[in-house]
C-alpha cells in the first residue's frame, strides 16, 4: 500500500488537537485519511497510519468511530479502520491490521528479536527435566508424545528438536503483529505477543512471550485477570477468569478458567481445566478437571476426567520430584483419589481411594482400582459393563469443538480398537496365569501389588472374552460390507499397537516412521506431519489386518477354514456378545432409577410425591435417551447380524 507524508496544514491541525511527533516526516498516512480522527497522539520512529471510515458498535449500542485517541505509538503501523484509544503507556514495534479495536491498555510492545513463545521448553512429566518438549505453533499431541516419551532414541530426539527449531526460526521477528478484527480492551501488560485474526483480549493482566493462534472461524478469547508467560494458545481456545499459565501449550478448542493454575504443562485439543492446578502434566485430548481441590502433577492423561480432590505425588522426599505416572486413555479418578507415582493405570479404568503401591495395571484395562483397608483391590474388566464408559465414548466425538479444517491433533475415538483389545488378550492371559499359579480355589490373587478376588478374576476373563468377540464381529462385518475378499493384502497392522496421545496405530508403522526420521528420509516437519496423517487415515485398513490374524488365533482356524459356516458362527457369537453387553449396560442404567436414588426428592410429601418429583426432574427410565439408545442398538445390531447370516447361508 502506498502512503504519503502529512501536509503542513495537517501537521498544524494535529498539533492543535494535542498530537506531537519526534519527526513528522517519519509519519506516513493513507492518501485518503481524515485527520480529524487523530487526537492526542504522540508519534516516534517510523509510523504508518491507515484511513478511518468505519465505526465500531459496542455492547449496549454505543458507537465508536475508528481513529487514534490518547495514545503513544513508536515504530508502529496501523491498518485501515482501526480504533486505538486510551493507551496509558505506549505501543511499540507492532503492525496492527485493519478493523482492530484497542482501548484502555497499559502497554503493548515487542522488545525483539522474539519468537512469540515458539521454542519454549516445557518440562513435562519430570519436573527436574529430561523430557522437555519444545513448543511451537504447529505442535501436535503426536509430535509432543515422541519428543517426551522416546528419549531412549536420542537421534530421533535431536531430529525432532531440529524440526521444531526450523519452525521457531520462521516465527522469530523484531516486530509483532496484531491481526485483523482483533479486540484488546481493559488490559495491562502485553509484551512479545503475536495476536492472530479475530482474537479477543478482555481484561487480561499480563501476557508475555506468547502466541494467540486465533482464526476467523475459530477465535481465541483471553479473559479478565489472566496472567500468561511463555505460552502458545491455539485457535478456538478460551483462557478466562484469573487463570495463570507459565511455560504452557494450549491446544485447539480448550477451556481454562475459574482461577486455574498451570506450569510446565501441555494441554491438547478439547481439554477443559477449571479451578484446580496442574504441574508438569501431559494432558492429551479431552483431559478434564473442574474442581478447586484437584492437583494433576507429573502425569500423562487423555480422555480423562479427574474427580474432586484427585491428587498425585511425584516426590518421595529423597532425590526430588523425579517420579512420573501414566493414566492410559479413558482412565479417570473418583473424588478424593490419590496415586503415588510411579504408577501406570490401564486404559478406561476408574481409580477410587488412595493407592501407594506403584502398581502397573496396563495389562488389565477397563478395571476398577479400589482402596480397601489401605490396600489396592482390582476388579478387572468391570468398566466394560458400566453405562458411564459408553456414555463417555459417545460424548467425546460430540464435544470435539474444533473446526473441520486445520485440525492439528490426530484423534481416534474408538473404544474397542487393536490397542485396547490386545490389552484384553494379555489380560485374559494374565488372569489365567494367576488362576493356574495360585489355584482355581483361591479366594484372592496378588497382581502388581494389588489384590483380586476370585469372583472378580472369573468375571474379568468372561467380560474380556465378550468384548474381544464383539470387536472381532465388528471388524468382520465392516470388512464384509466392503469386500468378500477377507484376506488382507498387507501385514502392516500386525503386532502390538500404540496410543500416541490420541493416534492409535501399529507399533511397526510408527517405528518405521521414526526410523525414517532418524535416517533423514523424513527431512522436514511437514513431511513428518504428512506421514502421521497417512497413518491416521489408514487406521481401518491396519485394524482389519490385525483383526484378521486375531480372528484366526482366537477361533483356532487356518485361512482355508474361513468358510461361510464359520463366518456365520462368528457373527452369531458377535450377536450374543453385543446383546449381552447391552443388557449389562441397560441394567447398570436402571440403577440410576432405583428407590435409593430418589432420596431427597419430594421434599414436603410422601413416597408418591417423591416419585412424581423424580419423574418431573429426571424423567422415566423407559424414556431416558441413553436407555432408548441401548434398546435401539440391540435391535439394529441384531438385524445387521441376521442380514449377514442370511447372505452367508
Walk through the language-model features, giving the residues of each.
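Basic/polar N-terminal segments that are highly enriched at the extreme N-terminus
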Residues: 1-2
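Glycine-rich hexapeptide-repeat left-handed beta-helix
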Residues: 5-6, 12-21, 29-68, 72, ...
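Well-ordered, non-transmembrane segments within structured domains
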Residues: 73, 173-223, 228, 444-457
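Long, charge-dense tracts
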Residues: 89-90, 94-101, 106-116, 120-123, ...
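Long, compositionally biased intrinsically disordered regions
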Residues: 105, 372-649
